[in-house]
A protein has these predicted regions:
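Divalent metal-dependent hydrolysis catalytic cores, especially in the metallo-beta-lactamase
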Residues: 78-89, 99-126, 131-132, 139-152, ...
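Active-site gating loops and adjacent loop-to-helix segments of metal-dependent hydrolytic enzymes
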Residues: 62-95, 171-174, 220-239
């Protein structure tokens, strides 16, 4: 396959890209008008760039706005309440249908790498099971990383630790957290230490929702940073 009449960043003129087995094998400047083959793509003089990255999305909750009700306050915490009400109604098929539609839209907009947080504060882990299936189904479209995300807390949710560990055993790539949503500061600190232990033990990456609040006393970012520093895990840890 060839992509012809392509413009590249910081390059003059038009270029032709040669692809083999889904990868770019060669890029050359066009010196004459190329012939368009049946499997080729004419970029029409448009810019060709590497694929984009979606570093933070919640695919399990996509396309659910207004279900079962609208977030009338516009606050994060009412949004979480709305999702908790919607979450009890999800099924595997419901999740797969919404995720499939969203992934197609992402790919159509040039996104090839996706990191999605998936709520694992669900005794059945329904959304996670569906997302693991979608990761395989969509490999031809996107590279997907799945974050085991404890939306309702690790220490504050019944069997929260066990659900996190099970999510990683099932195939989640990244350990998540939400320390500011735990009931107490002590529980928030404990949740950070637990998730860092889990990531260190399993070799997973870390991506923690941290201090999403106007409360100036919410200071879990420094707890996470110190855990990352003391364990020499800085390059594996994201606060988002």
């Amino acid at each position: 396959m060839h992509i012809i009449n392509a413009r590249l960043r910081n390059q003059e003129g038009l270029h032709e890209l040669h692809l083999e087995n889904g990868l770019i094998s060669n890029i050359g400047r066009q010196t004459e008008a190329p012939t368009l083959g049946p499997d080729d793509l004419d970029a029409g003089g448009n810019l060709v760039v590497p694929p984009f990255v979606e570093p933070h999305i919640h695919l399990d909750a996509t396309l659910t706005a207004g279900e079962p009700r609208w977030n009338m306050s516009g606050t994060l915490f009412e949004g979480i309440e709305c999702w908790s009400e919607r979450k009890v109604t999800i099924t595997g098929e419901d999740t797969r249908t919404r995720v499939r539609k969203t992934l197609q839209s992402l790919a159509a907009h040039g996104i090839q790498h996706v990191r999605t947080h998936v709520d694992v504060t669900d005794p059945q882990l329904t959304a996670l099971k569906a997302m693991l299936e979608m990761r395989e189904e969509s490999r031809h479209l996107v590279d997907m990383q799945i974050v085991a995300f404890p939306q309702e807390g690790i220490e504050s949710y019944r069997n929260g630790r066990e659900l996190m560990e099970e999510a990683i055993r099932m195939g989640a790539d990244v350990v998540g957290g939400i320390p500011h949503f735990e009931y107490t500061r002590d529980q928030g600190v404990s949740s950070v230490k637990f998730l860092m232990d889990l990531a260190e033990r399993t070799g997973c990456l870390v991506d923690v929702h941290c201090d999403e609040t106007d409360d100036p006393h919410s200071r879990f970012l420094e707890v996470l940073a110190e855990e990352a520093r003391s364990r020499d895990m800085g390059s594996r840890v994201t606060a988002s």
